[in-house]
Design a protein with these regions (language model features):
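Acidic helix N-cap motif at the loop->helix transition within catalytic regions
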Residues: 17-20, 48-56, 102
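Short, acidic, metal-binding catalytic loop of nucleotide-sugar glycosyltransferases
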Residues: 24-35
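A conserved acidic beta->alpha catalytic loop
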Residues: 25, 43-52, 94-97
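Glycine-rich, basic loop-to-helix element that forms the pyrophosphate-binding segment
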Residues: 69-85, 106
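Conserved donor NDP-sugar-binding/catalytic core segment of glycosyltransferases
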Residues: 102-134
Length: 147
């Protein structure tokens, strides 16, 4: 069997505070078989510096590609990314998350062992600033009835 390839899709909009960390964590994935075909960042018409950050990072790795999402919504971004993806598999990630280096391998191993068509990891939110809203989101996403 030929080597599988993965297209990573990251929808984003106004994520200038987080996008570099997300992309950097993806670039640091343990990928011994070099299966990451491309990293598609689908931007929903950001009005901050998100697109500039992505464009700058794209100069360091030709797998990083910036796509436009004129509809702004995440569902539309995913549809755009899926249509443009060239990998055998799609990995959907969030723009304001940082992933552990073994995330790709763990997902790949779990999919192979289980035969599942869709796998993912546990979300462990970290509050970077002490805002009430951030604390509320953290409480909801870590409570057993919140997710």
């Amino acid at each position: 069997m030929d080597k599988i390839t993965v297209s990573i899709l990251i929808p984003c909009r106004n994520e200038e505070k987080f996008i570099q960390g997300a992309i950097t964590s993806v670039l640091e994935f343990e990928d011994p078989d070099q299966i990451i075909q491309e990293i598609l960042l689908i931007d929903g018409m950001s009005t901050d510096n998100t697109k500039n950050i992505i464009s700058e990072l794209a100069t360091t790795d030709n797998r990083i590609k910036l796509l436009e999402n004129p509809h702004k919504h995440q569902a539309a971004a995913l549809n755009i990314g899926i249509r443009q993806a060239t990998g055998d598999y799609i990995m959907r990630l969030d723009a304001h998350a940082v992933y552990p280096a073994d995330y790709l391998i763990l997902c790949q191993t779990t999919a192979k062992k289980s035969g599942a068509d869709n796998v993912g990891g546990i979300v462990i939110p970290k509050i970077s600033q002490s805002y009430y809203c951030a604390s509320l989101v953290h409480a909801l996403t870590t409570h057993k009835f919140g997710v």
